[in-house]
Amino acid sequence: MKQLIILLIIVSSLSCSTNQIELDYDSLSEYTIVTKDRALADTLNVYLKKSIGVELPIENKLKGDKKFIHLKYNSDVLTDFNSLIFSDYSITIQGNNSKMLRYGVYEFLENFLGVRWYSTDLTVIPKISKINIPFDKEILYEPSVTTRTVHSRLFYKDSSFADKLKVSNEAFPNYVSNARVHTFHRFIPYEKFYDDHPEYYALRNGKRLATQLCLTNEKVLEIVKDSVASFFKKDYLSTVISVSQDDNTQYCMCDTCSEIDQREGSPAGSMIYFVNKIAKSFPDKTISTLAYQYTRKPPITKPDDNVLITLCSIECDRSIPINEGCKDFQKDLKGWSKLTENIRIWDYTTQFTNFLAPFPNWATIKPNINLFVENNAKWIFEQHSNNPSELFELRSYMMAKLLWNPDLDPDMIIKDFTDGYYGSGGVFVAKYIEEIQLQLNKAKPFFLFLYGDPSQAFDGYLSPKNLTYYDNLFIQSLASVSKQSDYYNRIERA
């Protein structure tokens, strides 16, 4: 698993090392920022000025024996990476592209200056007198998840904040805007074709239904190819399009489709048969399709190299990790991972029926992400509530942090966030999370489902007794901070 690669020492242990250099105001003032990216240098200077009081000169080339902070592109490496290199009189921050270089600067600010970007309404820049940096060390990081998305308006509405948390600022990056998911009806609209050509659609119980396409009909293939070409022509900067089933389970069971599905051991057989043919016509593009509900079980045939499998965990219990409570999904995930390295996970981390109700899935977020990464998931889309919900800011932050580095400790993330975002009230918010998770565990087996209802937990973690206890924790949390403070408003919003 491509995770945190540390050549000599891990960041969290740097503060304990004796092999360090202390940079105070005077010694740091001797440094120059060297880079061709003036905007990034200005960003670094903003934080240095606010934290330690230093604003460094900026040059675009290394000159003489000056001490420097070098912000450097290294395009020789094709895979995403960034690195922090510390030597006698230099700090070099590298990335293989502009985004990864920015991420490297943010890593430096976070790990060595203590900067935190908790939400769009709170950035913490500690006032410090010195920076402790390691001597003669390199820290190299290659993210195992290359496209990280948390379905939260905090990231969608503020691309700068998304950058700092190292996630995308749109739900479907690089996708054709009008063909992202459930697209069959967009390529061959039922209202346009069904009356004259019912044979284009699914055969079930002797009748053609305008539900899904017949994937072995050659005319359907040609129309979809033409439609895909038209979509790409209109949205020429996009590199990905979804060619995927509509949101129902009424797939075609004609003799030809059924023969393929039986041979392949899954209705995904006819889907991959069809999508591979589309993909061959667009070798420089990525064709995304769904492994969802009836197509979740993998077939025998491998998807082509430019096919992206979007595997959806919609059926799974969120009270326990997938590898413990959703064995069928785990089996399908492992099956797909043997067929392709192009897997995009569509995961679910909220309850669609009531976004504001408590949804104690805290203990499953990290193990589920770890499971996805271990099975070739290079893209992960965590479908959160998008709009404000229970502990919205914390959930957005925590999922982003774990997508960037799945090795992080979620309890440490929660403590860091609650202390920083809620001030002295944070300890009570953290206690609430701990307690509701404990009460869920006591109620097991309990199926925590995205289409469930809070009323199902009224005898368990949402019992009157438990609700009273949780309420008292928030009363204590509010009482611990000034009513006029931002902390108070954030606790009320939690």
Indicate where each model-derived feature is located.
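Feature activates predominantly on carbohydrate-active enzymes
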Residues: 23-25, 30, 35-43, 47, ...
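Acidic, His- and aromatic-enriched active-site or binding-groove loops in soluble protein domains
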Residues: 261-278, 305-323, 403-409
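Sec-dependent N-terminal signal peptides
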Residues: 4-14
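Substrate-binding cleft/loops of secretory-pathway carbohydrate-active enzymes
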Residues: 288-315, 356-364, 389-396
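Short, well-ordered secondary-structure micro-motifs within conserved domains or adaptor modules
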Residues: 48, 56-82, 152
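Structured mid-domain segments that build the active-site/substrate or prosthetic-cofactor binding neighborhood
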Residues: 219-220, 230, 328-424, 431
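Catalytic domains of carbohydrate-active enzymes that cleave complex glycans
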Residues: 59-61, 403-494
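Glycoside hydrolase catalytic-domain groove-lining segments
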Residues: 298-306, 311-351
